Amino acid sequence: MPVITLPDGSQRHYDHPVSPMDVALDIGPGLAKATIAGRVNGELVDASDLIENDATLSIITAKDEEGLEIIRHSCAHLLGHAIKQLWPHTKMAIGPVVDNGFYYDVDLDRTLTQEDVEALEKRMHELAEKNYDVIKKKVSWHDARETFVKRGETYKVAILDENIAHDDKPGLYHHEEYVDMCRGPHVPNMRFCHHFKLMKTAGAYWRGDSNNKMLQRIYGTAWADKKALNAYLQRLEEAAKRDHRKIGKQLDLYHMQEEAPGMVFWHNDGWTIFRELEVFVRSKLKEYQYQEVKGPFMMDRVLWEKTGHWDNYKDAMFTTSSENREYCIKPMNCPGHVQIFNQGLKSYRDLPLRMAEFGSCHRNEPSGALHGLMRVRGFTQDDAHIFCTEEQIRDEVNACIRMVYDMYSTFGFEKIVVKLSTRPDKRIGSDEMWDRAEADLAVALEENNIPFEYQLGEGAFYGPKIEFTLYDCLDRAWQCGTVQLDFSLPSRLSASYVGEDNERKVPVMIHRAILGSMERFIGILTEEFAGFFPTWLAPVQVVVMNITDSQSEYVNELTQKLQNAGIRVKADLRNEKIGFKIREHTLRRVPYMLVCGDKEVEAGKVAVRTRRGKDLGSLDVNDVIEKLQQEIRSRSLQQLEE
């Protein structure tokens, strides 16, 4: 009979099989009331599942990440329960958990309106407030199939036929009269599912195949308590205000149009930000001793076949042909960098060789996945590849890590989650090589005092990698930086160097990106700063304004002086009230507004005002220029007097 070992090491002995709920009750009624599920020998199970042998057990509650995920999954079933009551002929497809919530794909003979969604949410609340028990039954494959055939659930039948073995015992979850099929676990009672909201609907093809029927996807969010739900909805509201597409239009940064889906038309102010970002990256390339190169936009398909990209990536590649040759528009820069490395004989003395490029890449992303600057078809990577020996890997990775944190800190990103992906089952190279490579990456992270978590088996077949995910002011995750070891591509493309023993050897290649895509990173920055770019990045850094025509000459002189000092400046001499001008440039998020009245002209000064509405008073012109230059030069995130 089972001996149950709890997380604190204590043990409980039973003379009969017990469930996680039984153990929780044994510990105390408070824990039993909070129990959502259990983790038995590392595997999540329902609170009602029986444990027949000795096992370790952790009780899962709403405070656990897994508990919240289970709540969300059960809310998807609750949605199914409600929709079948409102529209009984609905056919249910799949209802998984996603970030911050869940969705359910349904086949319904009407297009859901906003009023329908509100009615559906209301019915979900009515059902959840009944606090009914969720009953799990493990049945044979044949019984499960018969259940769903009788209920006309053709999609569930298809899942059984195509995805579940005949000797398996699927779990059927009974929500009163509604039955759904799932691996589970799910909540034992609907009292855990009171804090949710339906968010939107969208179209989705069955199994993601455009040849199949288009279903309606209903998205929802769910949380453990009302406070967490409200906080999330507030974050969404703030995110909507910060949407880079909205701000991009307001500030005239860029646009996109139907004739070039997923391609950016940069306007002057947006392109100014892009170029300033390039200047910043170039300064870091110089500091960390990189060469900068430029490869062609397209290369013969034969080359992409050699690299393996054609076999694995051709659907995402744009192609063209000329003179009976097929060319691929590059989706990435690495093969081109190997071609540059291969020009001329290389010695071990030439290594490490660090090669960087602002590479213009194109990928044929599905049109439905395109999203402003965040998901595009044409983008610029701040890409680099380091060619080195195995002995140099650790030092080079160390330098890459320092560079990543150096650059992210400039933008104020402090919360960065790091993951190390290790060898997959299918891979090239010896175990010894992988042992050393993984150890080199881990030691480099440890030497920089960076906490990280392993993603076991998630590395590429050609080498392990480090991923850097930064979190913005709304605590949203953005995976931007990567450091990826590659033991395959140099060999495939015949890259070599002459070692100390005069023998030809294949270099290790380190793929390194920090911002990822320039376009996407500008989108992230736009939302992070809500369009209030730090002065060094702002398209227009200063606007000089007159109050009346009598100050026009002084404004022009001052504007020229600022321009000569390397400051991006505009003069506003319009015959408008000064309050109107200040408000307009504040809405345009211009960092500084310099106002010139008769007093300022007479004293050779200027009244300085920030876009946040702070009045810095009347200051000496040369002092203002010096302070602005210092703020811009240091790439400060703070404005004067902040």
Swiss-Prot record:
Annotated catalysed reactions:
tRNA(Thr) + L-threonine + ATP = L-threonyl-tRNA(Thr) + AMP + diphosphate + H(+)
GO MF annotations in UniProt:
ATP binding; metal ion binding; threonine-tRNA ligase activity; tRNA binding
Its assembly, as annotated, is:
Homodimer.
Chain positions covered by the region annotation Catalytic: 243-534
SMART domains associated with the record = tRNA_SAD (SM00863)
What does the record give as EC number? 6.1.1.3
Q: Where in the cell is it found?
A: Cytoplasm
The note on the cofactor says: Binds 1 zinc ion per subunit.
**Domain of life (superkingdom):** Bacteria
Q: Which cofactor does it need?
A: Zn(2+)
Give the protein's biological function: Catalyzes the attachment of threonine to tRNA(Thr) in a two-step reaction: L-threonine is first activated by ATP to form Thr-AMP and then transferred to the acceptor end of tRNA(Thr). Also edits incorrectly charged L-seryl-tRNA(Thr).
**Protein name listed in UniProt:** Threonine--tRNA ligase
Which cysteine pairs make disulfide bonds?
A: none
Task: Please name the gene that encodes this protein.
Answer: thrS
Which organism encodes this protein? Answer: Salmonella typhimurium (strain LT2 / SGSC1412 / ATCC 700720)
